[in-house]
Amino acid sequence: MLSWVEKYRPKSLKDVAGHEKVKEKLKTWIESYLKGETPKPILLVGPPGCGKTTLAYALANDYGFEVIELNASDKRNSSAIKKVVGHAATSSSIFGKKFLIVLDEVDGISGKEDAGGVSELIKVIKKAKNPIILTANDAYAPSIRSLLPYVEVIQLNPVHTNSVYKVLKKIAEKEGLDVDDKTLKMIAQHSAGDLRSAINDLEALALSGDLSYEAAQKLPDRKREANIFDALRVILKTTHYGIATTALMNVDETPDVVIEWIAENVPKEYEKPEEVARAFEYLSKADRYLGRVMRRQNYSFWKYATTLMTAGVALSKDEKYRKWTPYSYPKIFRLLTKTKAEREILNKILKKIGEKTHTSSKRARFDLQMLKLLAKENPSVAADLVDYFEIKEDELKVLVGDKLASEILKILKEKKKLERKKKKEKEKLEKEKKKEEKAKEKQSNLIIQPKEIKEEVKAEVEKKEEVKEKIVEKPKAEEVKEKSKTEEKETKKDKKKGKKKKEDKGKQLTLDAFFK
């Protein structure tokens, strides 16, 4: 049993709800193929349920083309695309029919399973002789960015609520449902432009047997979160105040982020210089209110900023531009991402300066600028400051660049070397000084002062006198007299002996006398 979505899928373009201008473009495009021309493939971009695939099949049916489809459920890697799409792009069916190739949800071609898919698809497009229609929810998906130059992008908007209601009304009549218009309109409102979801919801209520208005109210709200590209498209395409101001309602971004997106893409969309000038005048005013939000922490200013950056910019142009514009990611965000590491390093330096100088980050930032200036004008002084603030090599390179950093570090290295040398010399002198002091102290312990010498000599003399008195006592008179008599006797005796020897010497010594 077919679902109602498939059962009531339009077989012809005239039965497709809405998208009148898109249908005309598709007719012109397919007819150029029938004339032997080979225009660029079409990329239909729009939210889920807006009728992208239905349009492709209805177009093929109207012009007698056989559809070759490759959707998200199929493998779409390099070999699969080459095998299926590559062959169909350059040949016809056995019945002589031409092929219309439909690649559904090409923005989902990514990951290992689909490796090389987009690259192979570009090769196929370059050689294709048959028409190719691609569909995507998001034309700005990174996975298909390289594909955009080779296709013509056609933007589809969500199906209008009235168009959804009309389709539901027809289905209800064909199915014989007893349902009032109020309930059908509620289902249409809940769909948020997703016709497929609306048909599924009606079928679910019919199967449940409850087609009341209350049951329709309980249906899940299918409002999708709009991405920033959807919001940009609304703001930059419309000239209606009310539509522009509601463009950001479902966007999960703060005004300070949105303003960067708008500023980046205004010059891409607006063609007249005066329009661009007016738009940036409104953006400038919006930015002032955002500044007040930051300074005063008063978020009520956001509503003024939002109105200026949406309605103000939208009404700056003289006319709507029907062209498709490839909107860009803000360069400032790419730059901030690129310089994130550098900014973290600068914040570290600011913290070091603040801690050393006991100042605020604002004042430290001023000191940082002075340090950068000194690095150019007086690298020697800058080297001292780098040392004082304990700034590392990688931090210095971010601050002043590699060349200046190398020069300052070289100076600092020489200064450090000189300091170490001076320190060693100082330590050496201190050691020698201490050595001399110790030697003097030792010598001073050996040398006695004059007063001490006098006292010691006196004490020594007294000591010697005492010893002398004990050893050498004065002799008595009798002992002296007796000693002199003894000496006289010894003297006389010695004289007699000497006389006798003299006489003996003069006599002849005989043998008898010799032996006697």
Swiss-Prot record:
List UniProt keywords, sorted A-Z.
Answer: ATP-binding, DNA replication, Nucleotide-binding
Domain of life of the native organism:
Archaea
Q: Which Pfam family is one of this chain's hits?
A: RCF1-5-like_lid
Indicate, by first and last residue, each region the UniProt record lists as having compositional bias (Basic and acidic residues): 426-443, 474-493
Q: Name one GO molecular function term.
A: ATP binding
Look up the signal peptide feature and give its range. Answer: none
Entry-linked SMART domains:
AAA
Q: Where is this region: Disordered?
A: 422-445, 474-516
Q: Which GO terms describe its biological process?
A: DNA replication
Q: Where does ATP bind?
A: 46-53
- What InterPro entries does the database record attribute to this sequence? AAA+_ATPase, ATPase_AAA_core, P-loop_NTPase, Rep_factor-C_lsu, RFC_lid
Its job: Part of the RFC clamp loader complex which loads the PCNA sliding clamp onto DNA.
Q: Which family does it belong to?
A: Belongs to the activator 1 small subunits family. RfcL subfamily.
Q: How does it assemble?
A: Heteromultimer composed of small subunits (RfcS) and large subunits (RfcL).
Q: Which HAMAP family has this protein been placed in?
A: RfcL (MF_01508)
Q: What is the protein's name according to its record?
A: Replication factor C large subunit
**In which organism is this protein found?**
Methanocaldococcus jannaschii (strain ATCC 43067 / DSM 2661 / JAL-1 / JCM 10045 / NBRC 100440)
